[in-house]
Amino acid sequence: MKAVVMAGGEGSRLRPLTIERPKPMVPIVNKSVMAHIIDLLRQHGILDIVVTVQYLANEIQQAFGDGEAYGVNIQYSLEATPLGTGGSVKNAQEFLDDTFLVISGDAMTDFDLTAIIDYHREKKAMATLTLYHVPNPLEFGVVICDESGSVRQFQEKPSWGEVFSDTINTGIYVLEPKVLDYFPKNKNFDFSQDLFPLLLKNGDPMYGYVASGYWTDVGSIQEYMRATADVLYNKVKLTEAIGDHIGGDIFVKGDVEIAADARLYGPIYLGRGVKIKGLAGDFLCLKGETDGN
């Protein structure tokens, strides 16, 4: 099984965090969003990874290289211009000769990928969409499935008057390589707006798997802050601990110096090289020396 990590996003709604880094390289506590995704893939035995890159591609390539340091094998597919979600994966078609998983490099999740893949194979699906219940579906594609799990209806980013479900498309898919033959290479197309409506029209087997666990699209400053807080509050099942828990929702990793009179209010993450003096808190993720105010 191979995975395609879509990592070409610019992340304009995350500025200023993304002025000098691509969206997948934004740090969530102790590592980048994409590093968390790589960890999740490795946890589920998915070691062959194709990363689609476009905006500040060198930043991602330099950070992850061939993947050896992360225990995986990474190849890159470069887009000269943005091609959309489907177009970027189509651009990597030469690497995809069997069933593969698609996942965003800028989402935070702990979904059971093995269960999703098993479901896809059990249903003999052409495409399986990973779905999730959310309280506000307006920013996502809304999906309805029948009792068998077959996708019957969806609406991309509906208004409240168009909302017919709280089950949304997370952008995590298991696909058969044949679906990429529907569109030519170097053509801009989107999975939700172009490919999936076509599969539905053609009657191709397309199923939805409603996942449990944690998922959020780190697409705005608000969601970035929420994801960071959720990691600090242990709401996300990570593959490894973010650091040593020293009490009061305070985590440290590496060489950290805390002055005897320092006052800390969690949740806080203190990384290597941090020296704390005075007052620090809350929702802090620090690296290097800091003077509290």
Walk through the language-model features, giving the residues of each.
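Catalytic-core segments of class I nucleotidyltransferases/pyrophosphorylases
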Residues: 46, 100-101, 108, 114-121, ...
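N-terminal glycine-rich phosphate-binding loop and ensuing alpha1 helix
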Residues: 1-61, 293
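Well-ordered alpha-helical segments embedded in enzymatic catalytic cores
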Residues: 36, 87-91, 195
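Conserved beta-loop-beta/alpha segment of the NTase-like Rossmann-fold superfamily
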Residues: 61-62, 67-147
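Extended, small-residue-rich solenoid/repeat segments and analogous flexible loops
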Residues: 200-283
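Phosphate- and divalent-cation-binding pockets in alpha/beta enzyme and binding domains
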Residues: 13, 59-62, 91, 112, ...
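A structural signal for short hydrophobic beta-strand segments in well-ordered beta-sheet cores
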Residues: 25, 143-145, 196, 208
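Generic beta-sheet signal
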Residues: 6, 28, 52, 77-79, ...
